[in-house]
């Protein structure tokens, strides 16, 4: 029998309550972003985890139940690209039924987020969506993501999610010097006043696959100064201790913007 939901959560070494669990449902993705899964490494011959070796949906649910019994409240579904995983909506439906889990979110590139799937995900119990989008202009988008379809497909996915009832959609943009720092202001303008929360992420070291260099990092300090040249933003207090993004708001009431630091 599964243990009852914990009244207190375990803490990490910094005294922060462990309330979130991130579950990667696949290592595959239809994007080949240069800072994450560059094609020269993740090409046709790359050995992804065989599908029959992935955790089955029932195994994922069991893990979620164990963590819920330890005090976890939030589940984040990730990949790769999680929408590649078959029966994703059924998985979310099962997780939503777990006692103690009160928030389920998903990080996606939104390229598969059709109107029907957005509604199905909402109906299954998905609470929040985060979309990865690093540029708005066609050339930079295709260069960064190494895909053959237009950026409008991602923007349509975001709109489909909004129409399905998802609120406060988060937009994550990784900024790399020499690649897409010119996209910062266009992104800030585009999502101003939309209800979406734009979050800029410093270029991060993900091991040996992206040839990370410190001088390619555009710091949060630089990003804030750049945006403030055109659109005034002000810092606000975090929602809770240990929140990942540093929160700011447009001074004119146009919504929230965040910064996630890597160094």
Could you tell me what each predicted segment is?
Residues 2, 139, 151-155, 159, ...:
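Radical SAM enzyme [4Fe-4S]-AdoMet core and its adjacent flexible, acidic
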Residues 2-79, 83-102:
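Conserved alpha-helical substructure of the radical SAM core
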Residues 25, 108, 261:
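Short beta-strand/turn micro-motifs composed of small residues
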Residues 26-28, 124, 251:
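A short, compositionally biased micro-patch
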Residues 40, 79, 108, 133, ...:
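Residues that line or immediately flank small-molecule/substrate-binding pockets and catalytic motifs
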Residues 42, 81, 135, 175, ...:
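Flexible, active-site-proximal loop/turn residues at the rims of small-molecule/cofactor binding pockets
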Residues 43-47, 137-144, 207-211:
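A short acidic, helix-capping loop that chelates divalent metal ions and anchors anionic groups
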Residues 57-76, 84-197:
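Radical SAM/AdoMet-radical enzyme domain recognition
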């Amino acid at each position: 029998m599964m243990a009852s939901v914990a009244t207190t959560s375990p803490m990490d070494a910094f005294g922060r309550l462990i309330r979130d669990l991130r579950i990667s449902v696949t290592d595959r993705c239809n994007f080949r972003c240069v800072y994450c899964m560059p094609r020269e490494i993740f090409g046709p011959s790359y050995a992804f985890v065989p599908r029959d070796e992935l955790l089955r949906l029932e195994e994922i649910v069991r893990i979620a139940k164990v963590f819920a019994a330890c005090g976890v409240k939030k589940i984040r579904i990730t990949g790769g690209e999680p929408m590649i995983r078959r029966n994703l909506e059924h998985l979310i439906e099962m997780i939503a039924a777990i006692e103690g889990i009160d928030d389920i979110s998903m990080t996606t590139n939104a390229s598969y987020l059709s109107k029907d799937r957005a509604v199905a995900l909402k109906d299954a119990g998905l609470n929040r969506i985060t979309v990865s989008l690093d540029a708005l202009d066609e050339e930079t988008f295709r260069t960064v993501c190494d895909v053959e379809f237009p950026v409008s497909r991602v923007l349509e996915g975001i709109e489909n999610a909004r129409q399905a009832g998802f609120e406060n959609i988060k937009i994550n943009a990784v900024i790399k010097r020499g690649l897409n720092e010119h996209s910062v202001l266009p992104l800030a303008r585009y999502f101003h006043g939309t209800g979406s929360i734009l979050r800029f992420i410093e270029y991060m070291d993900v091991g040996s696959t992206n040839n990370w260099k410190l001088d390619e990092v555009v710091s949060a300090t630089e990003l804030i100064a750049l945006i403030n040249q055109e659109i005034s933003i002000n810092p606000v207090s975090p929602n809770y201790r240990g929140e990942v993004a540093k929160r700011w708001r447009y001074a004119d009431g146009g919504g929230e913007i965040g910064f996630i630091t890597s160094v």
